[in-house]
Amino acid sequence: MVIRGDNITVDFAGATLQGTPADTAIRIDGGKNVRIIQARARGYKVGILARGTRNLTLEDNDLSYNWKPRLFSLVEHESLVDWLSFHHNEKDEWLRFGAAIYLADVAGGKIVENGAVQGMNGLLLVRSNGLSIRGNNFSFNSGLGVGLYRSSYDTIVHNWIDYNVRGYSHGFYSRGQDSADLLIYEQSSHNVIAHNSLTHGGDGVFLWAGQTTMDSGTGGANDNLINENDVSYATANGVEATFSRNTITNNRAWGNEYGVWGGYSFETQIVGNDFTNNRFGVAIEHGRDNVISGNRFLHDSVAIKLWADSIEPSDWGYPKHHDTKSRDYRISGNTFVDNHVVLEARNTTGLDTLAAASPPSLSPPHFSAPTTPLSLRDRSAIVVDEWGPYDWQSPKLWPVDSTRAVPLRLAVLGPPGTWRVVSQRGIATLSKTSGRMGDTLAVTPAKDSTGDWEVMLEYKGQQFSYGRFEPPIRWTADSKSLPRVDFFSYRPGHWSLQATGTVTLSPGFYTLRAISNNAMRLYLDDKLVIDAWTPHESKVDYAEMPAGQHTLRVEYNQTDGWIELRVEIIRGRPEQYTLP
């Protein structure tokens, strides 16, 4: 649907638009005083796209379950394929990621009580100013809840923007892969971010001055107010605010890697926040003239860390235009309780710490933001599968430990209730055949299952399952056997591999999937089927794999940095995995 003109209200009255991934459900071209209310859109790359509209109102629209990409990180280790980059959007590069709502050059209006869950991105603003964004639910997306690019004077208050995350596996890795509940990028200034729930994201708030500032040293994402938000349980940072000047006050930051990461921040106020059970409460490198005052630091490993490195990246323009010494901090009136280290400072001058601490108090600072039972859980509630974050609204089986463990322990996740086993294949034993949600089910695959097994459960009439399809490939390299070709590590040097494997597949349709960086070739029965020998960043390639007995050969050569190589056989034809 395309909408053009002024003073238009389109009330969908709950009607649903059902589309395909390449499409946009509703497009608004220019105009003023345009209202879209009670629309439902499913299956689109973009739900609502507006350009150049003045005084736009989007109210009570449900734009959930639209496009999102498959993820390739595993329980045991991540994949670099899944890392995001939002650094450039001058030519609508962000549209490649899709969005429930994408607003470009929109001036004024309100975005109220909309929902966008289980997609990749919720709301993206590009050069869009003066918007009031209130009472929305942009949660459980695999990229961003809300993203701003060159967007200023917007007010984002009283929203639920939780669990926008990827790149996390509890007990194995905590990377985030540049996902975030709220992203503020590239000269986005004078925004008010207040009273929001921003929990369990890659970051809670991810603010970066932008490439313009990095190159020229000018501008920044400055004078934003981040006040009374819950930025807890992020995989990385509750608030990341870099190369800019901002005010961060009265927020709750519990259980993050970093409560506030403020690299190269200047004249920034960090006041009245509650930092509890973080690895670092506040960490700032190369910052200057910052204030850290009236905060509570409780059970953080390191409460405050300030430092400067002797060498800065040579390709950054920013240090050539700014004094980037770590200097001139005012640290006063903070409460420190049971922190391993209170203040760690290195290569830092001008520290005013005479009044750094107040008498200890266990009472948290005043705080007001929306909460839900899920927003109060710790990071163990973050479960990310190949389609993004799990929302706890439906039943799910998920490994408690490594997927290689035998027996394999599976957590039965979901709302309260009971479950029962309705079918099983390729399994020797199950620890139980019925129980309650929250149980752990131990599965021992049969020795003759050849890596092909599944257990299916039922909860209130809904079936859900967990299984494995991993045909045994007898790999050898340098006359040594390999259990699988799955390598992921960082090591300087020039590592290489040549491995040969044999496999037998029963009748059916199969696909070879290779995930690689650097340089890789894959041969099937001595025929080159995937040629990725030109040095490249991590990517995914597919090739058709016939049934029967076959020989595979993979060649890999590291050119720099990270090593990522994974070769696997999956069910189905390649086109099933390469659709947009």
Stretches with model-predicted labels:
Residues V10, V34-R35, N159, N191, ...:
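Short, well-structured beta-strand segments within conserved domains
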Residues G31, T53, V106, S128, ...:
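A generic structural motif
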Residues I8, V34, L56, G109, ...:
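Short beta-strand/loop motifs in extracellular/secreted proteins, especially
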Residues T444, E454-T511, I515-P580:
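Extracellular/secretory pathway-exposed regions associated with glycan biology
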Residues F12-A15, A39, N61:
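Extracellular beta-strand-rich, repetitive "passenger/adhesive" scaffolds
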Residues T20-D29, G47, T57-A104, K110-E113, ...:
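Acidic/polar low-complexity surface segments
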Residues S375-K480:
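Long, low-hydrophobicity ectodomains and other hydrophilic envelope-associated domains
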Residues M1-T16, G30-N33:
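Beta-solenoid repeat scaffold
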